[in-house]
Amino acid sequence: MDAPKEIFLKNYTKPDYYFETVDLSFSLGEEKTIVSSKIKVSPRVKGSSAALVLDGHDLKLLSVKVEGKLLKEGDYQLDSRHLTLPSLPAEESFVLEIDTEIYPHKNTSLEGLYKSSGNFCTQCEAEGFRKITFYQDRPDIMAKYTCRVEGDKTLYPVLLSNGNLISQGDIEGGRHYALWEDPFKKPCYLFALVAGQLVSRDDTFTTRSGRQVSLKIWTPAEDLPKTAHAMYSLKAAMKWDEDVFGLEYDLDLFNIVAVPDFNMGAMENKSLNIFNSKLVLASPETATDADYAAILGVIGHEYFHNWTGNRVTCRDWFQLSLKEGLTVFRDQEFSSDMGSRTVKRIADVSKLRIYQFPQDAGPMAHPVRPHSYIKMDNFYTVTVYEKGAEVVRMYKTLLGTQGFRKGIDLYFERHDEQAVTCEDFFAAMRDANNADFANFLQWYSQAGTPVVKVVSSYNADARTFSLKFSQEIPPTPGQPTKEPTFIPVVVGLLDSSGKDITLSSVHHDGTVQTISGSSTILRVTKKEEEFVFSDIPERPVPSLFRGFSAPVRVETDLSNDDLFFLLAHDSDEFNRWEAGQVLARKLMLNLVSDFQQNKPLALNPKFVQGLGSVLSDSSLDKEFIAKAITLPGEGEIMDMMAVADPDAVHAVRKFVRKQLASELKEELLKIVENNRSTEAYVFDHSNMARRALKNTALAYLASLEDPAYMELALNEYKMATNLTDQFAALAALSQNPGKTRDDILADFYNKWQDDYLVVNKWFLLQSTSDIPGNVENVKKLLDHPAFDLRNPNKVYSLIGGFCGSPVNFHAKDGSGYKFLGDIVVQLDKLNPQVASRMVSAFSRWKRYDETRQGLAKAQLEMIMSANGLSENVFEIASKSLAA
């Protein structure tokens, strides 16, 4: 294997040759597939004598022609990664024809062209197209494509590719063909092909200009009934994008295909979106509310890419957040408008804190726009996506809805059908609004989560209230020193009755800004600065970073009393939730310290009262209450410790949950009883909120291990009319080891063994369990007939799930580490992308005590010494060891 090579943003150069048109032809076969490409090539500089270097991986080259002339072996250079054509016609353009042979049935990496459950399918982003044919596999090569697909008519009755269907027909030998043409220029990562035995759910959407678009969702016949929600979601997304951003669909056909073997969640290929089945298929009996919500969001996300990603794409892969950060922001807004904005915001911020903050503090920390990579697949991360979305959200916070829309409009006006950079998006936002963004671009170039400290003071004589901010970004690999960045802080001030004070003016840096309203945006751009509010009649309680206005960690001088006050009164619902979370984190950290010193644990009664009053506040959204009474996760608490202690944190969280359940059991029982329903399942916010609150209360009660509550949960399991309620009852019961748990897990499997998506949930529930010694159960499940190491969803459920139980993954004897190490080496031979996702669980090994460090390090070293290690796994393992 060649030594892994690091690619750097600073080394970007324009291509020497552009491709204008690409005509592809596929002859699909059982043993081999022949791919022919005919490309119109033009030099960037006329008369250029530069060599044309094409990427290619795992391809058998059959022939190369230039302007119809067959090249001999001495006319080109071929190695394991490239086809180089050194001497080319110097005229304005020429035609290049290449024939290759590939073997999709042997392709377990699931990138390029592969077989999934008997069907042909593609995944080309980021660099999978080079596994199909020799090509300049980079996103700034945008061309117009046609694609002719031919295959056996019985085995592959449906032949799909991008764009519009031009012609189709039968050919000899029981075969048939379809010819597709995409009128829009696109990079090769958006190419797609699907062939197989599929049926479609059909519908139409009439765009605002009156064009009728044919919509088709393709699945195997038995799954067709489960596509109704996906079609609803697609039509809702199309309407929303027109209403909110003025963006209309640009072709006459939109296809979605669901496949069971898929590395990612879904892929936005032009007019032929390919989805992981779990993000398309749903019925009340086989999918939970969380699945329905995920399908809505991801179908929105991939559809929104038609403009933010496809019509305007990335110049190079370092700019990935240009399309992904923006499109995640758009799907978050869409889901917020379809449900509860506050609850969606809480869910998104929780995800950021649980997954992205740790990444930003570990060996894989990288900016929203990375400076370098060995394997681009490793940078489809929570930093690029979720932190990237927060960066886009800050533009909207600063510019307002109308200003943000003006920026988006200018972005498309300037860059339609171009491959551009993060600076181009920044410039459109700035120029459309004549805005001063100071040092905002630092968000794209600096890794690490800023830590903002806030100190307040009140001057009763002058009736002024001051907020002093200081910001610091911790060092990250390759970035020891940081510059201050632009942090928008949305602030409100509460009076002693809990009402927002109307603000009149704020003094900052020698200027006075007049404001009117109950909240304002402070622009923090320096290492230290002060803002002084005037005409404040009494000492207020500040509500800071309303709506989580910047992706930062915040340290304030708010007392516990202030936090209880905000929990009870803040008009910003996000900050009500946040006050409860800050209190819970403080409380749990103190208890961890007590536990480590063998002191008895006791719960602050004020905390119980605070949550109790939220629980009984009928004016609050039920899903908000469910979120507000959910404790911070073990990972969040460990993140705040100098040396993470999984055993202590697990014991403390379990103690707090049981204490809350015990003290609030009457209220919790009432909630379960009052929020049951025997009516048919409806996916809407009020029903989802009702189920979320009921099931959160049920989980609390079942944690008490009281026979009466176990019976209650068992009854909920048996009486449930949908999977949301049934699975929540199953999860509540399986918290506690014993015969009841074993029996009910067996019952659930027997009921759903023929539905692979439900079985994956069954795997996940067992793998994430905190019951003692769970690694042995998970090892047994590897041999379960329903498990398959070649299927990414099953790996994410069983192995990824196990890594999500800190107490078992970080078991003191190293059994969790050894289990994962062995699996990663096996997986890497099959699917390097999935293997590198799994090895990431080791990345923060230095956060733990010396014994655990030694055990984890040994596994990383074992992985690094494996023969034929992929670049994907090498990059994560080597960076983790070097930390």
UniProtKB/Swiss-Prot annotation:
Entry-linked SUPFAM superfamilies = Leukotriene A4 hydrolase N-terminal domain, Metalloproteases ('zincins'), catalytic domain
Tell me which domain of life the UniProt entry assigns to the organism this sequence originates from. Eukaryota
- Residues flagged as site, Transition state stabilizer: 385
Keywords, comma-separated and alphabetical: Aminopeptidase, Hydrolase, Metal-binding, Metalloprotease, Protease, Zinc
**What phenotype has been reported when the gene encoding this protein is knocked out?**
Reduced fertility and shorter siliques bearing a lower number of seeds compared with wild-type plants. Cytogenetic characterization of meiosis in the mutant line reveals that both male and female meiosis are defective.
Cofactors required = Zn(2+)
Under InterPro entries, the record lists:
Aminopeptidase_N-like_N (IPR045357), Aminopeptidase_N-like_N_sf (IPR042097), PepN_Ig-like_sf (IPR038438), Peptidase_M1 (IPR001930), Peptidase_M1_dom (IPR014782), Peptidase_M1_pepN (IPR012779), Peptidase_M1_pepN_C (IPR024601), Peptidase_M1_pepN_C_sf (IPR037144)
Report the co-factor binding details. Answer: Binds 1 zinc ion per subunit.
Q: What is its EC number?
A: 3.4.11.14
* Pfam families for this protein: DUF3458 (PF11940), DUF3458_C (PF17432), Peptidase_M1 (PF01433), Peptidase_M1_N (PF17900)
Q: How is its activity regulated?
A: Strongly inhibited by puromycin and DAMPAQ-22.
Q: Which residues form the active site?
A: 302
Alphabetically, the GO molecular function entries are: alanyl aminopeptidase activity; metallopeptidase activity; zinc ion binding
Q: Which GO terms describe its biological process?
A: proteolysis
Role, per record: Aminopeptidase with broad substrate specificity for several peptides. Involved in proteolytic events essential for cell growth and viability. Plays an essential role during prophase I of meiosis. Required for correct meiotic reconbination in both male and female gametophytes.
Q: Which family does it belong to?
A: Belongs to the peptidase M1 family.
Query: What NCBIfam families is this protein classified in?
Result: pepN_proteo (TIGR02414)
Q: What PANTHER family does this protein's entry cite?
A: PUROMYCIN-SENSITIVE AMINOPEPTIDASE (PTHR46322:SF1)
Protein name, as recorded: Puromycin-sensitive aminopeptidase
User: What organism is the protein native to?
Assistant: Arabidopsis thaliana (Mouse-ear cress)
